[in-house]
Amino acid sequence: MQNPKDDVLYAPIEWQDHSEGYTDILYHKSLDGIAKITINRPEVRNAFRPQTVKEMIQAFADARFDEQIGVIVLTGQGEKAFCSGGDQKVRGDYGGYQDESGVHHLNVLDFQRDIRTCPKPVVAMVAGYAIGGGHVLHMICDLTIAADNAIFGQTGPKVGSFDGGWGASYMARIVGQKKAREIWFLCRQYDAKEALEMGLVNTVVPYAELEKETVRWCREMLRNSPIALRCLKAALNADCDGQAGLQELAGNATMLFYMTEEGQEGRNAFNEKRAPDFSKFKRNP
C-alpha cells in the first residue's frame, strides 16, 4: 500500500527515448537513473531472433556503462507477452538461429551472461507469456515483477530444445530439483500466483499497475549504496556461477581495495619510485 509520506516512489516517470537505430527493441532512460529495454516484436509474442539479441546486448552495454543509470528493466512490448523465447521460424539446422546473412547464432547465451555479471540490478517486468527462452531470461534477472496475467513455463522439449545452463541449474536453485524437473519434463504452464508460490517472481500486481510498481522497486534500490548492491549481487551469484562468479566477487573486492589509502599507498610508492610504507596500516584480527 502506498505510503503518503513517500510520494516520490510513486511519482510519474518520464522516459527519454533512445530507440533510434534499433529495429527489434525500444530503449528508454529516465532522469532518475532507470533504463528500460523493451523487446518490440509483439507480432510473434516478443520472440527473439539474432538481431533482437544483438540490439539488447548493445542497449544493455550502454546502460551498464552509463554512470547515471543504477537499475535496468527488461520487458516486452504490450500486455500479451514478455518474451516467448527464440523465434522458431529462424531456427536453422546448424546449431542456432539464422540472421539475415544466414549465419547461425546462440547469442542469447551472451546476453544471459551480461545480465548475470552486470553490477547493476536488473529487473524483469513481466506481462503475459514468459515462455521458453523468455522464461530463462526473466529468471536470470535479479528481480521479477509480474502482472496478474503473466504465464510462465518451459517449452524446450516440445520443440526439440533445452537450456542446460542457468535455465536448468538456476531454476533448480529457485524452485527445487523436483519442481524444476516437472517444469522442464512436462512443459506445463503456470499462472502468476503459482509462480509467486514457487519463488519464481517477487510480487504480482494488476497489469495496469505493473510499470508503476516496477518503477517503485527500482527507485527503492536507487536509494541504496551502489557498491553494496554490486557486491551483494556478485556474492549471491558466486555459488552458482563457479569460477566466473568468484572472479566477479573478487573483482569487486579489488575495486574496493583500490579505493583505500592502503591500496593507494602501493600505487603511489611505485609511481614515486620509493619503498611503500605499509606500517601505518592496522593488521586487524
UniProtKB/Swiss-Prot annotation:
Q: Which family does it belong to?
A: Belongs to the enoyl-CoA hydratase/isomerase family. MenB subfamily.
Gene Ontology MF annotations: 1,4-dihydroxy-2-naphthoyl-CoA synthase activity
This protein is called what? 1,4-dihydroxy-2-naphthoyl-CoA synthase
Gene giving rise to this polypeptide: menB
Record: residues binding hydrogencarbonate: 154-156
Entries under CDD domains matching the protein: crotonase-like (cd06558)
Keywords from the named record? Lyase, Menaquinone biosynthesis
As its record notes, the protein acts as a catalyst of: 2-succinylbenzoyl-CoA + H(+) = 1,4-dihydroxy-2-naphthoyl-CoA + H2O
